[in-house]
Amino acid sequence: MSKPGGHSRHGRRDGIDPVLRSRARRRALQAVYAWQISGGFAKQVIAQFAHEQAHEVADLAYFENLVEGVLSNRAELDTALTPYLDRSVEEVDAIERAVLRLAAYELLYRQDVPYRVVINEAIETAKRFGSEHGHTYVNGVLDRAAVEWRKVESGASGA
């Protein structure tokens, strides 16, 4: 629903509700975490969480895009993250690993989402679900990665 002036009921011209996007990211984290632990198939994981998510208002299309994107691009995401980690991807705590994979997907494949939003959401998600200091690790990794992955947007000189 739009208000006069072309803004949605959320005050944004693009019609995106940031609250619903945040919920979708949290649910995507849970789905990616479950996938990492169980090794299930992407369609099964998405179907399970999409069914559960039906009771919680969230951006279902965005949730599905995140989960499918991470699961189908896992190897590329892990390769992209590796230079910014102080250990192998598999040695990173499972929650922080899921947060990093989701954020890496958004930073690399969802150029429509500002890098600051991606990093802030990842930090908040890591605070909520991760280890006591996991959010600081996530922040450090993503800050360094964003300088390279989003050079134009972050204003990095490349030097």
Curated annotation (Swiss-Prot):
Disulfide bonds: none annotated. NCBIfam families: nusB. GO terms for molecular function: RNA binding. Belongs to the NusB family. The lineage of its organism: Bacteria, Pseudomonadati, Pseudomonadota, Gammaproteobacteria, Lysobacterales. GO terms for cellular component: cytosol. It comes from the Bacteria. This is Transcription antitermination protein NusB. Pfam families: NusB. PANTHER family: ANTITERMINATION NUSB DOMAIN-CONTAINING PROTEIN (PTHR11078:SF3), N UTILIZATION SUBSTANCE PROTEIN B-RELATED (PTHR11078). Involved in transcription antitermination. Required for transcription of ribosomal RNA (rRNA) genes. Binds specifically to the boxA antiterminator sequence of the ribosomal RNA (rrn) operons. Keywords: RNA-binding, Transcription, Transcription antitermination, Transcription regulation. InterPro entries: NusB-like_sf, NusB_fam, NusB_RsmB_TIM44. GO terms for biological process: DNA-templated transcription termination; transcription antitermination.
